[in-house]
A protein has these predicted regions:
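Short acidic/histidine-rich active-site segments
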Residues: 91-141
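A conserved active-site cap/scaffold subdomain adjacent to cofactor or substrate pockets
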Residues: 54-77
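Soluble non-cytosolic domains of exported or imported proteins
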Residues: 11, 74, 78, 142-146
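Conserved, mostly hydrophobic/aromatic
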Residues: 7, 32, 60, 101, ...
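Active-site environment of divalent metal-dependent phosphoester hydrolases
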Residues: 12-18, 35-38, 66-70, 104-106
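Histidine/acidic residue-rich metal-binding segments in metalloenzymes
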Residues: 1-29, 42-58, 78-94
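Mid-to-C-terminal alpha-helical segments outside catalytic/metal-binding sites
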Residues: 131-173
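A short alpha/beta connector and helix-capping loop motif
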Residues: 21-34, 115-123
Length: 173
């Protein structure tokens, strides 16, 4: 806090995340994850944690990484946008955004290196698998960063007005 760094609990456990809220003098963020109530992924976050983060002035950035999405690579834009609308109702439109977690144009060797046991002393495939250790395919509506307008369209189609949609797309930061 002293030097103004943002504390991000996207990769931390529930307990560590609550400790960060408790000890931080400033709001913290979950920069790239989704609610467990939408998809029970290892890295997605509980409703209680998201409420604590957002009620303390922090925010959540919704992840487009397939392992964090309901139906994985087959997740629809409508499903993703509906989850965002439900989250806006729960946590407030001013406390949510997009945290894509996309690894565009990265070779599978990058994710394989991350999982090779450097930190855990053993290979950890995360939500991948030994026989499919590379990056999962992105959903059809978000293959690359130039597809962000698809999300804006999805938010408007689900009922967000232009001001709300633009907040979610980045103005909330």
């Amino acid at each position: 806090n002293r030097i103004g760094l943002v504390i991000d609990v996207s990769h931390t456990s529930e307990r560590s995340s609550f400790d960060a809220i408790k000890y931080s003098e400033r709001p913290i963020v979950i920069s790239h994850a989704n609610p467990i109530w939408w998809h029970p992924s290892k890295r997605n976050k509980s409703d209680i944690l998201i409420k604590e983060v957002t009620s303390a002035g922090g925010m959540i950035g919704f992840s487009i990484y397939p392992h964090h999405l309901k139906d994985g690579s087959n997740c629809t834009l409508e499903s993703f946008s509906t989850m965002i609308a439900q989250s806006a109702d729960k946590y407030g439109v001013d406390n949510i955004g997009i945290g894509s977690d996309i690894c565009q144009n990265q070779p599978d060797s990058v994710v394989e290196w991350m999982r090779n046991g450097t930190w855990s002393k053993e290979i950890d495939y995360g939500e991948g698998a030994k026989d499919d250790a590379g990056f999962p395919n992105q959903p059809t509506w978000f293959k690359k960063t130039s597809d962000f307008p698809n999300i804006l369209d999805g938010l408007k189609k689900i009922g967000f007005n232009n001001e709300e949609a633009l907040k979610i797309m980045g103005l909330n930061l």
